[in-house]
Structures are given as C-alpha cells and as structure tokens.
Amino acid sequence: MTMTDPVADMLTRLRNANSAHHDSVKMPFSKLKGHVADILKAEGYIASWKVEDAEVGKSLTIDLKFGPNRERSIAGIRRISKPGLRVYAKSTNLPKVLGGLGVAILSTSSGLLTDRQAAKKGVGGEVLAYVW
C-alpha cells in the first residue's frame, strides 16, 4: 500500500518518538524528508540525521535532541498543508510561529526554506509544517 502523505508520516514519527523520550527514530528515506531533517538540524531541533542503506530501500535515522534534564527540544510539530487541502503563503504574508519563536517550513521555488529565509529571499510557497 502506498503512503499518501510521507511528510505527515515523518512528523508523526518524530512527535511520537519525542514524546516517548526515544533517542532516535527510523523511517523510510526520501529527498524531501532529508531536506526537512536538514532544516530541523540547522534550527537546533534535532541532534543529527543519517541515511542508512537497507535491503529494500534507504532508511533515514534521526537522533533527537534533549536538554540537560531530558526536556524536549521539540515542544510541538504540526503538518499544515495536506494532500486534501494545500496551504500557500505569499512572500508578503508569511506565517510566524509563536511570534517568531518557532519555525515554519516552506516549499518554495528555491527549495525548502524556513519562514525567515523565505522572507529574506522574498519568496512564498507551500507551508509544509510548523515546529516550535
């Protein structure tokens, strides 16, 4: 059976592993998931990620990041644009997550960008997710 929304599956796996205080989470790899993991790493929400070759396909392993007392670095993560209802934002109307404390991940013509990077470049696009 094919997966309808691989990004939502990735975010759900991250959310579940984070709330269960797992050290890492494993999922099927795709280029889009790799770019989302790049953004999460650059913004400081995850410790690291790597791609492993499996017999059937590639696998993405994300190492979660926790504070000194095992407090979570990801307080919340939400999928915004879904296959049934796409959500787009113009460059003049980019979303702010928690007044700028969180990050919005956008798919633009310049690749995947955060809301701040998209505002700097002056591009809009599809709002994939909010992370805070």
Curated annotation (Swiss-Prot):
Gene Ontology CC: ribonucleoprotein complex; ribosome
User: Gene3D superfamilies annotated for this entry?
Assistant: 3.30.1370.30, 3.30.1490.10
Could you say which residues form the signal peptide? none
Q: Does the keyword Transit peptide apply?
A: no
Would you say which domain of life the source belongs to?
A: Bacteria
User: What UniProt keywords are attached to this protein's entry?
Assistant: Ribonucleoprotein, Ribosomal protein, RNA-binding, rRNA-binding
Which Gene Ontology terms cover its molecular function?
Answer: rRNA binding; structural constituent of ribosome
So where does this one cross the membrane? none
An example Gene Ontology biological process:
translation
Q: What PROSITE patterns would the database entry show? A: RIBOSOMAL_S8
Oligomeric and partner information: Part of the 30S ribosomal subunit. Contacts proteins S5 and S12.
What protein family does this chain belong to? Belongs to the universal ribosomal protein uS8 family.
HAMAP family membership? Ribosomal_uS8_B
PANTHER family from the xrefs? 40S RIBOSOMAL PROTEIN S15A (PTHR11758)
Q: Which NCBIfam families match?
A: PRK00136.1
Its biological function? One of the primary rRNA binding proteins, it binds directly to 16S rRNA central domain where it helps coordinate assembly of the platform of the 30S subunit.
Tell me the protein's name: Small ribosomal subunit protein uS8
Species, as recorded: Renibacterium salmoninarum (strain ATCC 33209 / DSM 20767 / JCM 11484 / NBRC 15589 / NCIMB 2235)
